[in-house]
């Protein structure tokens, strides 16, 4: 019995250590740092270039079969729903980065097989920060999920919230990165 308990504790510790090593970073902004104007949305009164930032990750846990990236602004004044800025899923398990500028509507620069969902701007692809003027700094949460399945079966036209639900249901670990922007 003691051997079984020890084995379980050891396995849980190894899993926790593995998940703790899972990291998401960007050479384009520091964790908790300001997001530059070139990544800001172009439209809705914002005048950025709407270029998606570069993202790199490492330390995905054993058993990862694909990834999904969700970018959300919980500070958006939407009655509590926040705002979805980017949704990418079916990223192959072999991928370790998303290059700057890959978030175009056609997703041509994304790792092969990746699919972009519709954002709250109404279309697929990166929709950069664009908070209301004078609303303070918003927190843009980039969450990379390591998934237990190779491919998520998501219907065409699914909302970002539905995609987020399916992603969370299949997630085995997350790596997070926070960026700030206000105007």
Which residues make up each language-model segment?
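Positively charged n-region of N-terminal signal peptides that target proteins for export
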Residues: 1-5
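N-terminal signal peptide c-region/cleavage motif recognized by signal peptidases
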Residues: 11-16
């Amino acid at each position: 019995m003691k051997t079984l308990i020890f084995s379980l504790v050891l396995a849980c510790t190894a899993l926790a250590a593995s998940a703790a090593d899972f990291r998401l970073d960007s050479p384009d902004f520091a964790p908790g740092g300001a997001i530059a104007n070139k990544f800001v949305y172009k439209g809705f009164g914002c005048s950025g270039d709407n270029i998606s930032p570069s993202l790199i990750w490492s330390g995905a846990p054993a058993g990862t079969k694909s990834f999904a990236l969700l970018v959300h602004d919980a500070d958006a004044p939407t009655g509590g729903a926040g705002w979805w800025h980017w949704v990418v899923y079916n990223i192959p398990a072999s991928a370790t980065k998303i290059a700057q500028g890959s978030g175009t509507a056609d997703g041509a620069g994304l790792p092969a097989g990746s699919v972009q969902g519709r954002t709250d701007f109404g279309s697929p692809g990166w929709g950069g920060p664009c908070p209301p003027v004078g609303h303070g700094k918003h927190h843009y949460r980039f969450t990379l999920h390591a998934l237990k399945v190779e491919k998520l079966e998501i219907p065409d036209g699914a909302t970002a919230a539905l995609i987020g639900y399916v992603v969370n249901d299949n997630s085995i670990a997350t790596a997070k990165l926070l960026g700030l922007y206000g105007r």
